[in-house]
Structures are given as structure tokens and as C-alpha cells.
């Protein structure tokens, strides 16, 4: 985490290995950038967010509550609540709905025995 500005991380977040969160930025134009000027923009990650491995979160991004970010994503813009998003640049793929309650990767479902333990 490069935190020249605030980084707010909500409750019950999961981050896989090699997640990077950056708040720092530099000017685009070379002469201005060479002045060593640096700025920071706050990053906010909501509650119940899962960031897949090797995800990069860029300065100024707000990730809403109950979001899944796919592995290898580069998050350059805000992601709304209840979204599955992935890619470079990261884009919303779809909303998370009640139909996803028992879903695993590639639309597999949690088996009944495991589901009973989760619900206990």
C-alpha cells in the first residue's frame, strides 16, 4: 500500500496475494513530472470486498460494498456496490444477485453439506 493519501478499507474484506493499492500520482508532462511533484488521492474499499490476486487499485478509486474484483485487474475507475468486475482496465461484468448466494467459480454451486455448515 502506497499511502500518501488516506486508504479506507471496510469490514470483512479479502485480499489475495500481491494486491497493490496506490494513492500516489505524478504529473503527466515530463518537465512537470521531473520537478518531483507528487500528489495523493484517497482510495476507499467498501465492506465485504474480495480483491483477486495481483489486483492493482489506482489513486482516487472508490470500490463499493459487496464487490468482487477478478484476479489481475487494474482498477482505474469507481466500481459500484454489488458488482463483479475484472480486466485491464477493470470493468463491471454484472451485478451480484440473490441467485449468486450458492455460486462458486464458473457457476459451480456449494454442495449441500458445505451449505449446511455455512448456514449453521
Where are each of the predicted segments found?
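Terminal amphipathic alpha-helical/low-complexity segments used for targeting or macromolecular assembly
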Residues: 89-120
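Short beta-to-alpha loop/turn elements within the nucleotide-binding domains of ABC transporters
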Residues: 61, 73, 79, 88
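Short alpha-helix at the nucleotide-sugar/activated-sugar donor binding site of glycosyltransferases
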Residues: 14, 67-68
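Short arginine-rich
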Residues: 77-82, 112
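Nucleotide-sugar donor-binding loop of glycosyltransferases
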Residues: 25, 78-79, 89, 96
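Flexible, glycine/small-residue-enriched loop-and-beta-strand segment within the central core
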Residues: 1-62, 96-97, 102
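Short-chain dehydrogenase/reductase
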Residues: 50, 68, 74, 84-86
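Conserved catalytic segment of ABC-fold P-loop ATPases
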Residues: 64-67, 80-82
Amino acid at each position: 500500500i502506497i499511502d500518501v493519501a488516506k486508504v479506507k478499507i471496510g469490514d470483512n474484506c479479502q485480499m489475495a496475494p500481491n494486491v497493490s493499492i496506490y494513492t500516489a500520482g505524478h504529473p503527466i508532462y515530463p518537465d512537470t513530472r521531473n520537478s518531483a511533484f507528487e500528489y495523493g488521492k484517497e482510495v476507499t474499499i467498501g465492506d465485504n470486498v474480495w480483491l483477486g490476486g495481483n489486483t492493482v487499485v489506482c489513486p482516487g478509486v472508490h470500490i463499493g460494498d459487496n464487490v468482487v474484483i477478478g484476479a489481475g485487474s487494474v482498477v482505474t475507475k469507481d466500481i459500484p456496490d454489488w458488482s463483479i468486475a475484472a480486466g485491464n482496465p477493470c470493468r463491471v461484468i454484472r451485478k451480484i444477485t440473490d441467485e449468486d448466494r450458492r455460486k462458486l467459480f464458473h457457476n459451480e454451486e456449494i454442495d449441500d453439506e458445505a451449505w449446511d455448515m455455512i448456514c449453521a
